[in-house]
Structures are given as C-alpha cells and as structure tokens.
Amino acid sequence: RDELPNVLSLALGSYGLSPLENASYFAVFANGGRSIQPFFINKILKNGEEIEFLEKKEIVENLIESWVGKKFPKKESFTIDPRVSYIINDILLEATRRGTGKKIQSLNRDDFAGKTGTTNDAESTWFTGFNKNILTTVWFGYDQPASLGNNEFGSSTALPIWLNYMEEIIDDIEYGIQPRPSGLIAKKINLI
C-alpha cells in the first residue's frame, strides 16, 4: 500500500501494475481472501517429452520477490475478510458473464471470474482470469510504452491469448466456485 499513489483515480487503474503484481492481487479473491506466493511457469512439455518452452532464468524461492521489490505474504495470512473476497469474486464472475470478459463463455464453464484492462492510449492491455484452482494473467504490450493501435483493448488482445491457453488445459482444471462464507445475506433489490 505504501508504494501506491494516494489519488482517487487509483480505483480506475491509474497506477500501472506488473503482470506478477496483478496476478498476486487477484489471487486474494481466488483464494477466499488469502494471499499466496505467486510463481512463473518455467517449462512446458509436449506429450510429456519434447520441451516446447524453457524459461532461461533460474527460478528460486526469492527471485520473484527480488524482481518486484517486496515480500509476498504466505498462504495462511488473510489479506481481506473472506466475505469481502466473496462479494468481489461474485462481481468479477459477472464481468465474465455480461461484461468485457464475456468471451470466457466459450469455455462452457461458469466458475471463471476475470477482468480486462486497457491503459490510456492502449499502450498495454491485460486480462486476469481465475477460479479457485487456477489464476492466470496475460499482459499485452511493448517493453517501451507505445500505442497498440486504435480499438485495441484487453478484451480484443489479452483475453483471446488467455482463452487459447485455457482451451488447452481446461479439461484438467477442477471446477471451483468459492463457497459463500457465513455472515452474508443475499437480497434482491429492484428499484424499477
């Protein structure tokens, strides 16, 4: 919190997060209010044998923390109240049902929540999608900020990449919706 600017536009995304930070913060919602230690995929095998991709950087326990410059809490710690996590998770589920993340419906699963993002002038876009068993963030942009072009958004750039990845692994991901914590009451409100 100390490194975030104290400005009202922060809620609209005025502060740029790295993909790792984005995944770390969204993981709190995927884990019922608990913070987790994020990690990178460093190797992908085809048919269990041929290496399709191999991350060249050595992955060690504190490498991620050294890149980001701060410690991440261990899984046991609650960052936010589980009831708050559930409500935000429910809102993000709606974003994948009727909002900018609705392309997720092509997976024929109703347990994935997510959020698209687009910076000013479309210099970078992202999508973070998750259920309680997996969370993945895709960032799309240039190393040196430059516009991606007109009409480029998280839903048209990062989300399709995320979907392509998920289509390959979806059958191996267990269905997972957060259980409703005690202490929450659902009421239908209709002012029309």
Where on the chain are the PLM-derived regions?
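A penicillin-recognizing enzyme superfamily signal
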Residues: 18-192
